[in-house]
Curated annotation (Swiss-Prot):
Enzyme class: lyase
S-S bonds: C82-C101, C91-C225, C321-C329
MF terms in GO: pectate lyase activity; pectin lyase activity
The organism of origin for this protein: Aspergillus niger (strain ATCC MYA-4892 / CBS 513.88 / FGSC A1513)
Family per similarity comment: Belongs to the polysaccharide lyase 1 family.
Low complexity: compositionally biased ranges: 354-366
Pfam family, one: Pectate_lyase_4
Keywords, sorted A to Z: Carbohydrate metabolism, Cell wall biogenesis/degradation, Disulfide bond, Glycoprotein, Lyase, Polysaccharide degradation, Secreted, Signal
UniProt protein name: Probable pectin lyase D
EC number in record: 4.2.2.10
Role according to the record: Pectinolytic enzymes consist of four classes of enzymes: pectin lyase, polygalacturonase, pectin methylesterase and rhamnogalacturonase. Among pectinolytic enzymes, pectin lyase is the most important in depolymerization of pectin, since it cleaves internal glycosidic bonds of highly methylated pectins.
Residues forming the catalytic site: R255
Length: 373
């Protein structure tokens, strides 16, 4: 009987391992990402084990089947911060990271801030990793993920990253890339984040696809003091190429996205709902092709006062795209001022194989994020 039970247990583990893997294939600029490939799946059980698997030099398929709570793993830090947006209960405060309060908000009242130290810096993710969640069970709480300094070939799918010092700007980012290549982030939910849900830093992030994710900006704390998160998607790279597709951006108030500094963004078939401020902020060096997107109850789709980049976008289907990318571009819905006719954007993307956009819809609201593979 014991022998039979052991065989049954082994068979169950083998079946579980065989069933685990990346679902679907990446689209867009990171279409050739393979992550950990066919490596035998590993199932971390502690935060230390998860950090070790993500940061080592082995090709790995890492499966999350529980919540990994980093909130108290490094204790708390108490220091002097500032209150740039006031001290009302719904307003975020700011940590004085790198003298940010001192240099950029010198007139803001100072205040004492106490935050969870672990959240400040994300977990290092090394090359050739697939990080996959089981069902809706795979959650990283209190700390984000960080892909930097030349890492490549990473897939993150079907997990949630939540609760990173949401009271405090500079409390931590959910997903950080800086000098990373071939990164596919798919069906990830991010919620209650102190700073950016996604940030691509000033070094080149060559081929990145951010698809079918749920950026949940609903929070008790906000820089706009209204329960809508301001810091959402910041693309600040050098020679970056980013595909942003099928994502659901809910209750945001700014930087959704902010694009600048030689970043090429193909942003299509996303859904914005209940944005109390602006969605797009396009600075110098931001090149954006926006098509097939749907906007519902968005106060300002494009921040026109600070616009310095290049945009191709239209509220009606455009055949101008034909001669550059081999097909017509697809109209946005309720795009407001998100109109641009820069053929520089199209010309610079003409050598790339761009996925086709579908007609704009609200489907990401039910299809994006963890648990919706």
């Amino acid at each position: 009987m014991k022998y039979a039970a052991a065989l049954t247990a082994v068979a169950a583990l083998a079946a579980r391992a065989a069933a685990v893997g990346v679902s679907g294939t990446p689209v867009g600029f990171a279409s050739s990402a393979t992550g950990g490939g066919d490596a035998t799946p590993v199932y971390p059980t502690t935060t230390d084990e998860l950090v070790s698997y993500l940061g080592d030099d082995e090709a790995r398929v890492i499966v999350l089947s529980k919540t990994f709570d980093f909130t108290d793993t490094e204790g708390t830090t108490t220091t002097t911060g500032c209150a740039p947006w006031g001290t009302a209960s719904g307003c975020q405060l700011a940590i004085n990271k790198d003298d940010w309060c001192t240099n950029y908000e010198p007139d803001a009242p100072t205040t004492t801030v106490t935050y969870n130290t672990a959240g400040e810096l994300g977990i290092t993710v090394n090359s050739n990793k697939s990080l996959i969640g089981e069902g809706t069970s795979g959650v990283i709480k209190g700390r984000g993920l960080r892909m930097v300094s030349g890492v490549s070939n990473i897939i993150i799918q079907n997990i949630a990253v939540t609760d990173i010092n949401p009271e405090y700007v500079w409390g931590g980012d959910a997903i950080t890339l800086d000098e990373a290549d071939l990164v596919w982030i798919d069906h990830v939910t991010t919620a209650r984040i102190g700073r950016q849900h996604y940030v691509l830093g000033t070094d080149a992030d060559s081929r990145v696809s951010i698809t079918n994710n749920y950026i949940n900006g609903e929070s008790d704390y906000s820089a706009t003091c209204d329960g809508h998160h301001y810091w959402n998607v910041y693309l600040d790279g050098s020679s970056d190429k980013v595909t942003f597709s099928g994502n659901y951006l809910y209750k945001t108030s700014g930087r959704a996205p902010k694009v600048q500094d030689n970043t090429y963004l193909h942003i299509y078939n996303n859904y914005w709902e209940n944005n109390s401020g602006h969605a797009f902020e396009i600075g110098s060096g931001g090149y954006v092709l926006a098509e097939g997107n749907y906007f519902s109850n968005v106060d300002t789709v494009l921040e026109t006062d600070t616009f310095e980049g290049a945009l191709f976008s239209s509220d009606s289907a455009s055949s101008t795209c034909e001669s550059y990318i081999g097909r017509s571009c697809v109209a946005n819905v309720n795009g407001g001022d998100l109109t641009g006719t820069s053929t520089t954007v199209l010309s610079n993307l003409s050598g790339d194989t761009l996925p086709s956009a579908d007609a704009a819809s609200t489907s990401p609201a039910s299809n994006a994020g963890q648990g919706n593979l």
